[in-house]
Amino acid sequence: MFSYLQKIGKALMVPVAVLPAAAIMLGIGYWIDPSGWGANSQLAAFLIKAGAAILDNMPILFAVGVAYGLSKDKDGAAALAGLVAFEIVTTLLSTGAVSQIMGIPQEEVHAAFGKINNQFIGILCGVISGELYNKFHKIELPKFLAFFSGKRFVPIITSVVMIIVSFILTYIWPAIFGALVTFGTSIAKLGPIGAGIYGFLNRLLIPVGLHHAVNSVFWFNVAGINDIGRFWGAPEMAYADLPEILQGTYHVGMYQAGFFPIMMFGLLGACLAFIQTSKPENRNKIVSIMVAAGFTSFLTGV
């Protein structure tokens, strides 16, 4: 069980690794045009939109990246299966689809289905499709169906399985969503103490790699917190749709302390300190190690 959780944790690193790229593009864009946020500069607008494209589509990236990361041979067919799984679930469980399938007005559809496009669902789709790939990517079908044998069969079986999963989620997703919201808001409403608890949980789960699952609740719009999105959004809109229970206790960026700002800049200072204080006879070795480590930390957050 422990080794499998570590495997999922490693797979989660694939989509998480793109976050620094988004941060760099957004940061440079806002630096170029700090007042207009892209309105006064085509280059700034280009960079801001490019960075936002990554953040806005993190659920899809989780589905594709986790499926790819879990596949035994890191094949693109697994990534395609992850995308297929995500599209099926988010389409079947959208507010309009649930309204039509259940025969009820959209106003009566549970609010949880309006938040089906989130990182939790992306991770779930990625895990399921990745495991389906590992099980079926070498399957041999009868000769008249031979074209669909092997890896081509994976997206097909994924489609069937995700229809069943969607049916199950129709009844349990509101409860799961409610639990995620309760978990996130219960910690977030504690203010700085809650941020400390979140940091503790994050460090506690690092050995199995599941700290990324906890991060998704606070960094993205799973439970309404969306710390990264609020930080990079327009200042006047930072608290616009904040859950009422968090008013006065949440501050934008409080769940980024110790993370990407430190990974991208603080650790570079630490690397420089190592170089400056190294013995002359070892300096060349230390420089090569620290430059590689600092470069990796800045670009990937690892």
Task: Enumerate the language-model features and the residues they cover.
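A cytosolic-side transmembrane-helix exit/cap motif
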Residues: G96-E107, G196-N202, P235-M237
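Membrane-interfacial loop-to-helix junctions in multi-pass transporters
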Residues: A53-M58, I116-F120, G150-I156, I187-I197, ...
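Juxtamembrane membrane-interface segments at transmembrane alpha-helix termini
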Residues: G36, V89-Q100, I157, L190-I197, ...
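Juxtamembrane interface elements at the cytosolic ends of transmembrane helices
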Residues: I128-F144, V160, I168-L180, H212-S216, ...
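Alpha-helical membrane segments and immediately flanking helix-loop junctions
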Residues: M58, L242-V302
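Aromatic-rich transmembrane-lumenal/periplasmic boundary elements in polytopic membrane proteins
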Residues: W173-F231
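Early transmembrane hairpin of solute transport permeases
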Residues: F2-K143, F147-F148
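Interfacial juxtamembrane loops and adjacent helix segments
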Residues: N221-M254
